């Protein structure tokens, strides 16, 4: 492997397209900083150097090959931020398998769809999260697993492509491999075969698949490449001036790009230590930053609010903090100022992007004036073209004029898995990726988000897609038709609201709708507000005017926009941080 061509130490420097696989990036960092911390779980007493982490990844990769996992197979991981998660991210990359990230909020309905549509062959999972038993959910979808005499070779009627299920721990579960068993198999993989597999990889191979929805239909599997996420992670870290001396506190979910690209790959590219929390808890974040002397911290606005409002906040020494990223939803200036002044994050940055962009298009610089870091989402990362264009085409509009935000470059996805029509709608023949967001770019290239073309709702950093919830609610007895919109909320940015036309004699209300949804779809998708109506506002051609419903929602439920922000994230389950979009990343 040749030495990388890196930019000079100050600023972005000249762009060089460094096309490496993720395995090559890790190997290079392990060779440069073998004895520095790579992965730390402070609450577990778990700590690996780069040499140790690279060795663990090699053993796991060989074990996966011994299981029979082939290049191009999907390997789903349904887990919180456990230590095995990041090892699996690089082990799959080393053998050319595609890591399929699964949201831990998913229930049976969503898991069945994602594993089925992706034609996933392998699943790694933990046992449970809060009141949700992952193993029992899987057994209910694939009951054949419960009666298998041994692990491997699954034949499931509902998931016909799934062959192997692995438990991310030492415990044995019916029909599943354990992690010690997989590591023990590593000696069965011949060195020549292992090296040949790595040599067969192309940096433009798909290596990561994440499911994201649009306003028209169910989630789509976004295929991302080694080069796309690897180089994106490099420049995200570069904008923060990461070096091997930095230590990033990472409390955001790894199943979103915010965790596995902005976090993990930024650190691996620069040799910075990853101080990971399994789930978000504001007290645990403050403890980890102080104990590990973290220099950077990530989070969505509600997470930073919860940390600042924690009753013991003033007791913690956060003087080591320098930089980080706030993303996931709108980042208000008063909050940014508190983070800068009270948490010492004077070089905090803001990102913008979407999963299809690997995920970051633009990011502010640590030296940008604070007003620019509050009012804009920064400038395009090196190697990525960003323009504001006419929504009906791809022609660039004059600076200062609002239009749709597009990007083109190494970061654009390969496409949606087995959805060529959707891919063609998202990416123009010239290679421009449509964001669906509206923005304005100034003369200096700083981008400001002004709205969304899409109807997507962002609740506390989690992307919520109305069409998916509408199709689900149409299965509820008594519901004739339904429209889902975002309701303004000071606490979460937006809440989910549903307008329902009932069947004759039925009278669904908020409680009955929530009861119907509970346990079947992710909690953040369940409507908080419900209104029964006789009809929806229509255009002359019969199309539903959703913008009028959004206005009606704001009038019906004004109290939602007046909820206090203090401690907002603390009252919700641990994974409120989410899939950044809008003023966000991935």
Role assignments for model-derived ranges:
Residues 230-247, 254-296, 310-312:
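Conserved AMP-binding/adenylation subdomain of ANL enzymes
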Residues 106-116, 123-127, 297, 409, ...:
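AMP-binding/adenylate-forming catalytic core of the ANL superfamily
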Residues 67, 95-184, 504-506:
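Structural core segment of the AMP-binding/adenylate-forming
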Residues 18, 27, 35-82, 86-90, ...:
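Conserved AMP-binding/adenylate-forming core of the ANL superfamily
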Residues 379-383, 393-426, 462-464, 557:
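Conserved ATP/PPi-binding loop(s) of AMP-dependent carboxylate-activating enzymes
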Residues 168, 182-187, 269, 291-299, ...:
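Gly/Ser/Thr-rich phosphate-binding loop
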Residues 19, 34-37, 158-162, 166-173, ...:
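Conserved pre-ATP/AMP-binding loop-to-beta segment of ANL
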Residues 163, 521-543, 562-567:
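AMP-binding/adenylate-forming catalytic domain of the ANL superfamily
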């Amino acid at each position: 492997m040749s030495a990388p061509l890196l930019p000079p130490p100050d600023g972005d420097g000249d762009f060089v397209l460094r096309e490496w696989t993720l395995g090559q990036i890790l190997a290079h960092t392990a060779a440069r900083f073998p004895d520095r911390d790579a992965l730390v779980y402070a609450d577990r007493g778990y700590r690996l150097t780069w040499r140790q982490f690279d060795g663990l990844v090699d053993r796991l990769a060989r074990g996966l090959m011994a299981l029979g996992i082939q290049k191009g197979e999907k390997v789903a991981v349904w887990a919180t931020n456990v230590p095995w998660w990041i090892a699996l991210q690089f082990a799959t990359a080393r053998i050319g398998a595609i890591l399929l990230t699964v949201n831990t909020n998913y229930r049976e309905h969503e898991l069945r769809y994602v594993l089925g549509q992706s034609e996933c062959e392998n699943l790694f999972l933990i046992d449970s999260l809060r009141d949700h038993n992952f193993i029992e959910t899987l057994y209910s979808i694939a009951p054949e697993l419960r009666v298998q005499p041994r692990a491997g070779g699954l034949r499931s009627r509902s998931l016909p492509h799934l062959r192997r299920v692995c438990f991310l721990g030492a415990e044995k579960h019916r029909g599943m491999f354990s992690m010690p068993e997989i590591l023990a198999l590593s000696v069965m993989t011949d060195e020549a075969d292992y090296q040949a597999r790595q040599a067969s990889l192309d940096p433009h191979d798909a290596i990561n698949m994440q499911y994201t929805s649009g306003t028209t239909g169910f989630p789509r599997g976004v295929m991302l490449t080694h080069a796309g996420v690897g180089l994106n992670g490099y420049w995200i870290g570069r904008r923060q001036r990461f070096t091997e001396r930095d230590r990033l506190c990472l409390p955001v979910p790894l199943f979103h790009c915010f965790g596995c690209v902005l976090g993990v790959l930024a650190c691996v590219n620069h040799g910075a230590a990853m101080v990971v929390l399994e789930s978000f808890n504001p007290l645990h974040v403050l403890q980890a930053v102080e104990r590990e002397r973290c220099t950077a911290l990530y989070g969505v606005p509600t997470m930073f609010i919860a940390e600042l409002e924690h009753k013991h906040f003033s007791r913690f020494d956060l003087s080591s903090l320098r930089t980080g990223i706030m993303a996931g939803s709108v980042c208000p200036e008063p909050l940014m100022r508190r983070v800068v002044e009270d948490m010492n994050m004077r070089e905090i940055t803001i990102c913008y992007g979407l999963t299809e962009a690997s995920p970051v298009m633009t990011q502010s610089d640590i030296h940008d004036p604070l007003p620019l870091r509050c009012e804009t989402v920064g400038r395009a990362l090196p190697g990525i073209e960003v323009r504001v264009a006419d929504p009906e085409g791809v022609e660039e509009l004059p600076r200062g004029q609002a239009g749709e935000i597009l990007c083109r470059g190494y970061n654009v996805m390969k496409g949606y898995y087995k959805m060529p029509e959707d891919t063609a709608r998202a990416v123009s023949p010239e290679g421009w990726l449509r964001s669906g967001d509206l923005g304005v770019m100034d003369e200096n290239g700083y981008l400001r988000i002004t709205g969304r073309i899409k109807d997507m709702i962002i609740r506390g950093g989690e992307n919520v897609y109305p069409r998916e919830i509408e199709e689900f609610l149409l299965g509820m007895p008594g519901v004739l038709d339904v429209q889902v919109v975002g309701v303004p909320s000071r606490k979460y940015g937006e809440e989910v609201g549903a307008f329902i036309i009932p069947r004759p004699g039925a009278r669904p209300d908020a409680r009955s709708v929530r009861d119907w949804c509970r346990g079947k779809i992710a909690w953040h998708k369940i409507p908080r507000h419900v209104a029964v109506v006789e009809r929806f506002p229509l255009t002359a051609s019969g199309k539903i005017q959703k913008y009028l419903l959004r206005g009606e929602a704001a009038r019906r439920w004004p109290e939602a926009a007046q909820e206090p922000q203090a401690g907002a994230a603390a009252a919700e389950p641990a994974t409120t941080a989410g899939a950044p979009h809008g003023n966000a990343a991935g």
